[in-house]
Amino acid sequence: YEVSYADGREPPFPMVMKVPLMREGDGSENIVSFEVEQQLLQVLHGAHVPRFVAAGDLHRVPYLVMEHVHGITLDAWMQSFAQAREPIPLEAIVRLGAGLAQAVHSLHQQNVCHLDLKPANVMVAAIGVDGERIVLLDFGLSCHSDYPDLLAEEFRKAVGSPTWIAPEQVVGMRGDLRSDIFAIGVILYEMATGETPFGSPTTTGGLRQRLWVSPKPPRAWRADVPEWLQEVILRCLEPQASQRYPSAAHLMFDLRNPGQVMVTERGKRITGKGFWWHFKRWVRAAGMQYEPSPLPSQQIAEVPIVMVAVPNYDVSDVAMYALRQATARSLGTRPGAQLAVVTVVNTGLFGGSEHKDKSETWLQRQHLAGFRKWADGLDLSGHQVSYHVIESNDVAQALLRYAEGNNVNLIIMGAATHGLSMQRFVATVPIKVAMHAPCTVVLVKEQMPFQQLAETEAEAEALMPQPDQEMMESLPQSFPP
């Protein structure tokens, strides 16, 4: 129901009222789900959830008034392509998928798992080249780590929509943020192929098949699906939560940086797996134990995205060494962290006269080759690494935009060592980034390796004037106390 103020005041935004469906014969899950949504909407915030307005007493007149988000549901948008018998453009799939991952990540940062993600619960407020505002709806099956899980206490069974429910939810496990990543994978699969990976099962046995069944590869349905996109989708659909993306931010990162996705056997499949492969997987699934992450926000912090800002000019080997050492320390204390190595070049660099005989691709390759050489000294086992060259005339703003757009958790960059006397009046790039970054920033001072320090001291001693031998002999051999 649309809502307005009784006294005629103009509302700050369109409002809508939601009331629980309580017909004769309906189960108690309707009112329990309504109570969960009423509880969560009052504590959730951000652009990806409807704004809460008011709520009625559950024991008298239960209702919920919230922002009326204008737009189209993802389900209706997908149906428009199905009715026209046209495939959804891959660019739109990737863009909407990244926007959905961003919205889900915002939810996880507030310690909430949606647990009922499906196209009907995703509102696309705007569609265009500049991006979309994705708003998540219907939090009746959601779980907040700081509140009692009313659904888990009330029902001892799988709770969720059969088509999109994650394997761990099938066995009654709630509260793992990677369950939402599985649901995003189902949505991406459906957008790319027009089919659902596991059908729409109605029995417990049908639901449990996703614990071991590998879906038909998207490229078997649609030949123009690139390998990297299939890799992303099938990683989301892994039955073991530990083999999926550790957070929605990591999923969004890959969708926005397709050139950095490491394609494995998953991405190259064009046929489904055979009987014996599924039989072995079924045997493993029989004894599978699911261990959810303790808190969604803690899971995000434990497997962060680390960004290293590497200068591309006016930098010494000592500074690069110090930057590499700081990166090694950060990765050493963060197993599984994703590393993004970033540099910013001037807008006119690729078109300047000094590079007129070089292509932009060649110059990009030169920078990327330098990055990989710099990273040779790092232990990158267990870490996904990507390299990025950003073109901009404002280095600080480019780094900040990258960090915000990719949900970076930690920025490592060199501290300015020249012009120190002027830093009180003019903010340097590191200071600007540290002041406005959406995450922690580590500024690294120059430091030399111990071996080079020893060599430097030896050189200094060699250059020092040596005392005259006769003068030394004339000095007393001992001094009075």
Q: What does each model-identified segment do?
A:
Residues 59-73, 77:
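Conserved short submotifs of the Hanks-type protein kinase catalytic core
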Residues 24-43:
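AlphaC helix of the eukaryotic protein kinase fold
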Residues 100-112:
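Protein kinase catalytic-loop region centered on the HRD/HxD motif
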Residues 55:
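Activation-segment/catalytic-loop signature of the eukaryotic protein kinase fold
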Residues 299-354, 464-481:
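Small/aliphatic-rich secondary-structure junction motif
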Residues 96-97:
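Activation segment signature within eukaryotic-like protein kinase domains
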Residues 413-436, 450-452:
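Glycine-rich, Arg-bearing micro-motifs that act as flexible, cationic patches
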